[in-house]
Amino acid sequence: MKDFKLKDKSVKIKEMSVDDIDFCNDVPQMRYEGDQVVAITNLSKARTSWIRRGVEGADDKFIKSLSEDEKNELSLAVQEYQRLGE
């Protein structure tokens, strides 16, 4: 586990299982036209999945208390922490 500091909160980032990491990586969907990506969907769902599975105590109340910037920052921190072992 790793301590992570947001603006006015401290959280603990958990080590996730391979299944949870795969789930989070598979949430975003890309739509192609020919060889070009024209849309990426489910980005908010993916961000929430990373936070919910990768942060200790990340229930709805906690997630709703975060600003959009904090959600983005925390989601990226969770992903980076999971990649340390790769």
Pin down the residues of each PLM region.
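Short, surface-exposed, charged amphipathic helix/loop patches that serve as local interaction elements
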Residues: 9-86
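Short acidic-hydrophobic surface loop/beta-edge motif
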Residues: 1-9
